[in-house]
C-alpha cells in the first residue's frame, strides 16, 4: 500500500477527548477573545509607530494597568460581559501602544526583525499551546512553582544589573525569560482548562493570561533578534 494514498483524519487530529465539551466551548471563547486582543494591540502599535497620534509613555502604561485592574475587579456575569470586553479591548490597545518604543528601536536596526519576531512568536505560542492541549490534564501544572522561582531570580538579577551594568547578565536574562515564558504558555493553558472544568468560565480574564504570555514572548524574541543584528553590524 502506498503511504501517500492514506487519508489524514483531521477530525481525529483536532479531537480533545480528555476535555469536556463545555470546556472546549470555553476555550473557543478564550481564543476568540485572544484574536480580538491581537487585532486591537496591532492597531495600537500601528498608531504609535506610523501615525504618532498616541505615543507610548507613562500615561499609556498607567492606563493599561488601570484597565487591567478595573477588568479584574469587575465580576464576570452576563450583564457585565460587554463592559468587560470593552475593558479588555482598551487594555489590549494600550498594551500595543506600549510596544511602540521597542518597535521603533527594531525598525531603526533592521525592519525585517518585526515580521521575523512575530512569526517566531506565533509558531512558539502555537506549538506550546497544542502541546498543553494534547497532553494529559494537569501534567504541566507542576511548572507553576518552578516558573515563579525563575521569575523571582530574573527580577533579582535585573535589579542587581542596574548597579553592575553587565551585558552578559542582560543577555542571559533575555534568553532565560524566553524559556520561562514558553513554560508559562504550557502552565497557563492547562490552568485555564482546570479552572473551566471546576466551573470558572471567566473567559475574558483567562484571555488576559494568554495575551500577556504572547506579548512578553514577542518582546523577548524581538529584543534578542535586535541584539544579535546589532552585534552583526558591529562585526562588519
Swiss-Prot record:
Posttranslational mods: Ubiquitinated by BFAR, leading to proteasomal degradation.
Covalent crosslink: Glycyl lysine isopeptide (Lys-Gly) (interchain with G-Cter in ubiquitin): 7
Alphabetized PROSITE patterns for the sequence: BI1
Keyword Metal-binding appears in the UniProt entry: no
Keyword NAD: no
Residue intervals annotated with topology Lumenal: 51-52, 108-112, 161-166
TM region positions: 30-50, 53-73, 87-107, 113-133, 140-160, 167-187
Cytoplasmic-side positions: 1-29, 74-86, 134-139, 188-206, 228-236
Quaternary structure, from the entry: Interacts with BCL2 and BCL2L1. Interacts with ERN1.
Annotated protein name in UniProt: Bax inhibitor 1
Originating species: Bos taurus (Bovine)
Protein encoded by which gene: TMBIM6
